[in-house]
């Protein structure tokens, strides 16, 4: 019987299945951070249980770390407690930890792939909704809650029901300046923020194959923003070349054997999907969100939509509420909207390719008066590589702030946040009310578009910036 990639990955990891019961899956990799793990470790301690597979468990600090200093006290008391608990728990249970002073420390979904912890064919979980990022490698990766974190720590397994399948095909070639971020925002604009609910999405088509691994990670990172359980891209030579030689990747003959298996990780001819969505890459322009969910998105050359133009009463009410929160008026060109802050970073867009794209725009220009612009590399290795390439100097000379690795302004859990009413061009993944700080207004864009907003002081079409 012909199977989709998702079905192959799921079936290969079923440990036990009985009639009328949720299947039990084996988990190959468990990624841990300071926010969703303390209670899970406390649960192990209370029941006198060890971590079953410490060698398959990797921890880092990211959500509430300061990006201005490596001082554990810098982000407040709660952050300090969570980070100290992670240090204590990893020491006690034998889990490898990339702490604030470790050269590999960084955002969990940046660290995993760059250290070769993430490999094709694996099941990967983390107490974080954007675990879908790792699906870029052809791995079944999804976020879990704290009680499930404890279950995986104790058993290396997890009960999971089968999801529906969705194929999103992006045909043709994207125009110059159009990035994976624009592609995925255009997809969510078409499906809506709940269009993938109950599904695992496989992204395919010529435009997807043309993406680098960084681009594919951006794509899968935001699968959750259309309501999907996970996102997938079938592995290919781009994947294998990225993985080869990384710290935890197979070496020598083991790598060659692994590649032979990884080549089988693709949807069979004749396999059927529950839902199919198609987009033409050449029709995708630079995208900017205008509302308070990622599905409320338009091209940078468009005008702010009028809620009256929505036929669906729920969408109309949502648009009215979003415009009121965002302080925007219908009919205004997006390029007339001024910004206060710019954030280039997050598990969506903080990799070396993202920083290069932003630096290309920043080079020889200056951040607009009154704008604060942050560049936050996703990990220690990304920061080191960017500095070796001189990107930090480009940003600093242009007036951007060059920070230490962390989740930063993606979410208001550290010192990097918006003040009420401030408007931000952000390369992160969520533009919900208050996501970047109480009363803050978030517009999601690509790294190049964020840099363009920083130097012009308003949203600008990257295609018109020479």
Swiss-Prot record:
It comes from the Bacteria. It catalyses: (2R,3S)-3-isopropylmalate = (2S)-2-isopropylmalate. It comes from Salmonella paratyphi A (strain AKU_12601). Its EC number is 4.2.1.33. [4Fe-4S] cluster binds at residues 347, 407, 410. Keywords: 4Fe-4S, Amino-acid biosynthesis, Branched-chain amino acid biosynthesis, Iron, Iron-sulfur, Leucine biosynthesis, Lyase, Metal-binding. Signal peptide: none annotated. Binds 1 [4Fe-4S] cluster per subunit. Pathway: Amino-acid biosynthesis; L-leucine biosynthesis; L-leucine from 3-methyl-2-oxobutanoate: step 2/4. One of its GO terms (biological process) is L-leucine biosynthetic process. The keyword Nucleus does not apply. PANTHER family: 3-ISOPROPYLMALATE DEHYDRATASE, HOMOACONITASE, MITOCHONDRIAL-RELATED. GO terms for molecular function: 3-isopropylmalate dehydratase activity; 4 iron, 4 sulfur cluster binding; metal ion binding. The keyword Lyase applies. This is 3-isopropylmalate dehydratase large subunit. Catalyzes the isomerization between 2-isopropylmalate and 3-isopropylmalate, via the formation of 2-isopropylmaleate. CDD domains: IPMI. Belongs to the aconitase/IPM isomerase family. LeuC type 1 subfamily. It is an enzyme of class 4 (lyase). Its cofactor is [4Fe-4S] cluster. Heterodimer of LeuC and LeuD.
């Amino acid at each position: 019987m012909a199977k989709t990639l998702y079905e192959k990955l799921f079936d290969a990891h079923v440990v036990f299945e009985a009639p009328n019961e949720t299947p039990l899956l084996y988990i190959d990799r468990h990624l841990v951070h300071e926010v969703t793990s303390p209670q899970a470790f406390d649960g192990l301690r209370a029941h006198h249980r060890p971590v079953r597979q410490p060698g398959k468990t990797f921890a880092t600090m990211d959500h509430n770390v300061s990006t201005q200093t490596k001082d554990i006290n810098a982000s407040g008391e709660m952050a300090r407690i969570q980070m100290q608990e992670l240090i204590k728990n990893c020491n006690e249970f034998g889990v490898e930890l990339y702490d604030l002073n470790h050269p590999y420390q960084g955002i969990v979904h940046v660290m995993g792939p760059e250290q070769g912890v993430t490999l094709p064919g694996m099941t990967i979980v983390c107490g974080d909704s954007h675990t879908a990022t790792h699906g870029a490698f052809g791995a079944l990766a999804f976020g879990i809650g704290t009680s499930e974190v404890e279950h995986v720590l104790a058993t290396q397994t997890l009960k999971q029901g089968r999801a529906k399948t969705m194929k999103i095909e992006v045909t043709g070639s994207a125009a110059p300046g159009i990035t994976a971020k624009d592609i995925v925002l255009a997809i969510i604009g078409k499906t809506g923020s709940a269009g993938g609910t109950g599904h695992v999405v496989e992204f395919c088509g010529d435009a997807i194959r043309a993406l680098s691994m960084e681009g594919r990670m951006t794509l899968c990172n935001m699968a959750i923003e259309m309501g999907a359980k996970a996102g997938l891209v079938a592995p290919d030579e781009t994947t294998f070349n990225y993985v080869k030689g990384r710290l935890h990747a197979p070496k020598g003959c083991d790598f060659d054997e692994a590649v032979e298996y990884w080549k089988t990780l693709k949807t069979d001819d004749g396999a059927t999907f529950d839902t199919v969505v198609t987009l033409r890459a050449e029709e995708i322009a630079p995208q900017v969100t205008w509302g308070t969910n990622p599905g409320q998105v338009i091209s940078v050359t468009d005008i702010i939509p009028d809620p009256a133009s929505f036929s669906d009463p729920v969408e109309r009410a949502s648009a009215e509420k979003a415009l009121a929160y965002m302080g925007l008026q219908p009919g205004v060109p997006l390029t007339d909207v001024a910004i206060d802050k710019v954030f280039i970073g997050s598990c969506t867009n903080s990799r070396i390719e993202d920083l290069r794209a932003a630096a290309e725009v920043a080079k020889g220009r200056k951040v607009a008066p009154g704008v604060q612009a942050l560049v936050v590399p996703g990990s220690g290795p990304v920061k080191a590589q960017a500095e070796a390439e001189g990107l930090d100097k480009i940003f600093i000379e242009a007036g951007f702030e060059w920070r230490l690795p962390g989740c930063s302004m993606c979410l208001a859990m550290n010192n990097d946040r918006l003040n009420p009413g401030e408007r931000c061009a952000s390369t992160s993944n969520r533009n919900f009310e208050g996501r970047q700080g109480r009363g803050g207004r978030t517009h999601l864009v690509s790294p190049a578009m964020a840099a363009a907003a920083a130097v012009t002081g308003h949203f600008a079409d990257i295609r018109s910036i020479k």
